[in-house]
Structures are given as C-alpha cells and as structure tokens.
C-alpha cells in the first residue's frame, strides 16, 4: 500500500480557491493559507470549502514555522478552533500547541527544524506526546550530517510523516516507500526543496506499488 500523496497549493489570493478542482486527483490537497495577506478572510469561505473537506489539509503557518506571512497568535487560535468545529483537517505546529490550548485529535501535528538537527530524543518525545490522538505527526529536518539516523527509526510508528529537507526528490519517494504516512508534493510550484509535481509522484508510487504487487513481494 502506497503512502498518501499531498499536493501543496499556495493560496495567494482568495480567488485561487476555485483552482482546488484541478487537484482532486491527489489523495489530499494542502491549502497553504499563510500565503494570503489577510488570512482571516478564510472564515467567509468555509461553506465553499465544505464540499472538498475530505480532500483538504488547512495549513496556517507563521514565519517562525516556515510560513510566508506573519499570523498573530490570537487570529490563528480563532481560525483553528473554527476549523476544528467544522471538521476540517488542519496542520498545527507542536510548539504552537504547547503555547495554546487547542484540540489536535485527528489533526496533523508538525515539528519543523530548519537550521539545526534536533536530537533523536527530542523528536521521539514529540511523537510520543502527540501520536496517540493525532492523525499524523510530521517531522521535518534539514539534510545535515546524521539526519537519516534521526528520521528513519521514526518510521516504526504508523502515524508518522517524515520530511527530509533535501534537494534530492528521491529521498521523499524513499521515505514514502519505507512507511511515511504522507508524502508532500507540489500542485503548481515547488514550495520546498525536493518537492515533486504531484501527478508525477502518484505515477511513480503507483508504478512501484503495482510492480511489488504483481511480483508477490510483501
């Protein structure tokens, strides 16, 4: 069984939401709402988004978390609570959850490290703390010396999503084959290094999955 392919889509203008229809052949579509100048406007479009709910991941990432525009904590808390009440899947940073009382059951809890490698103990503690209730715990770390030794043991957990922040797209494919729950790709333009166009990623993973299935390899 292959991992779920996430097509990440930057919503730069609210009108871009109409383009969701173009990416419904992906398993999931990540709406990167932090590209919007005024993120609070999304409250007016919950009814529109509702028909795509089963396909969507809503991401509100501020600059400290690798986002594009700064989002005030109080606005983010308000929107996440609204999204929770309406049953949307969202992605929230573990550090934000530790500062704010927010529900995360059946949601994606992330930890992004951009400039240094965390210890294996640190990431294991995050997985242990959040994995029981979360839909997935996502760990993203840079491709510095020793990063594979930190990421690969995490794949024993069926809820884990790992992202090697490497320029080599093969690494994203590899972790998906090794057990990452989600593999992130791009819908229109790469939003992170190493991302592959989602249609190509689906073809690659389906081909490998079919080859394994037909050969009887388990």
Predicted regions and their residues:
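Acidic (Asp/Glu)-rich catalytic clusters
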Residues: 19-25, 40-56, 81-85, 98-107, ...
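Structural recognition of alpha->loop->beta junctions
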Residues: 25-27, 73-92, 127-138, 174-196
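Short, acidic/polar
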Residues: 9-24, 72-82, 118-129
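Catalytic beta/alpha-barrel core
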Residues: 8-10, 28-38, 59, 80, ...
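C-terminal alpha-helical cap/extension of soluble enzyme domains
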Residues: 152-218
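Active-site-adjacent beta->alpha loops and helix N-cap segments on the catalytic face
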Residues: 35-49, 93-106, 118-122, 143-156, ...
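Conserved N-terminal beta1-alpha1 strand-loop-helix module at the mouth
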Residues: 1-67
């Amino acid at each position: 069984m292959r991992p779920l392919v996430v097509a990440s889509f930057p919503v730069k203008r609210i009108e871009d939401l109409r383009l969701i229809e173009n990416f419904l052949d992906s398993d999931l579509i990540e709406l990167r709402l932090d590209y919007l100048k005024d993120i609070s406007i999304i409250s007016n479009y919950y009814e529109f988004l509702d028909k795509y709910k089963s396909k969507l991941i809503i991401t509100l990432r501020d600059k400290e978390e690798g986002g594009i525009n700064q989002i005030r904590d109080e606005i983010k808390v308000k929107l996440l609570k609204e999204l929770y009440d309406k049953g949307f899947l969202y992605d929230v940073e573990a550090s934000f959850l530790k500062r704010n009382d927010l529900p995360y059951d059946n949601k994606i809890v992330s930890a992004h490290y951009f400039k240094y490698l965390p210890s294996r103990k640190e990431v294991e503690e995050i997985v242990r703390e959040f994995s029981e209730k979360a839909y997935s715990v996502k760990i993203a770390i840079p491709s510095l010396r020793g990063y594979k030794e930190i990421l690969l043991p995490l794949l024993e957990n069926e809820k884990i999503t790992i992202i090697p922040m490497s320029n080599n797209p093969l690494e994203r494919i590899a972790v998906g084959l090794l057990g990452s729950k989600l593999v992130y790709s791009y819908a229109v333009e790469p939003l992170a290094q190493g991302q592959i166009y989602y249609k190509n990623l689906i073809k690659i993973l389906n081909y490998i999955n079919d080859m394994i299935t037909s050969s009887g390899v388990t």
